[in-house]
Amino acid sequence: GHRCAGGVADGERHGGRGVDNGTFVTAGLVLRETETKESDKILTVLTPELGRISVIAKGARSRRSKYTAACQLLAYDEMTLRRKGEWYYLAEASTIELFDGVRQDIEKLALAAYFAELTEAVCQDAMAAADMLPLLLNALFALGMLEKPDRLVKAAFVWRLLAETGFAPLADGCAVCGRESPEAPMLDVMQGVLRCGACRTGGGLSLPLTEGAVQALRYILYCPPKKLYSFSLDESGLRMLDRAGEAFCAVQLERGFRTLDYYKAFLVEEDGE
């Protein structure tokens, strides 16, 4: 059955718990679905306790499957799993939240798919996803339910996710002269430090930020998780913060993201960026 998560979605409520007959129950968010032979799917699932796992969903593509909704990208489910060797097999599933506000908007859905791909990239299999799951659930909730610009949700999610996984930039002042409010601030994306426009760091790629964007970045990095989207920033500052986040992400993770390219194709159509 489908039941709605009340308010902001929480990963904490649904830890793994054992059931007799070798199965156990866990909450999980589907980060990726891969079609395999016949009518099966392999799901990449983010769970509170096991981190990122692969789940084989037998018959999930069949029209008769009861679990079609639960086995789609970005479905947040309660799953009953059975483990065999390295693999988990889906025994039962019911959806907790499908994020309809995101699904009904192709642009938001494209952005959410990027959030999922990025989370998968930074969440190593064994790594406890205790912080990752609520972070991603809240981002999906913010995208679908809060009246916030998509660009704000994107910038905040990307910077916070990187910070939570050990890639936080040093944002408390100019790395060269120590000024707390850098003049004509720049972010050195190679070294992950702020500097004044006139102060030189190692000469790698640096991108400009406004003073407001610097304040917003500090807020994003240090605020309580539930307050992540409770800030505002003017359009030009937000564009700079977003661009710097994309560049920092690409440099630190040493890769691009297919879902991000797909999402950005929508933006080009809109405003010819």
Whereabouts are the PLM-identified features?
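N-terminal amphipathic/basic-hydrophobic helices that include classical n-h-c signal peptides
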Residues: 1-18
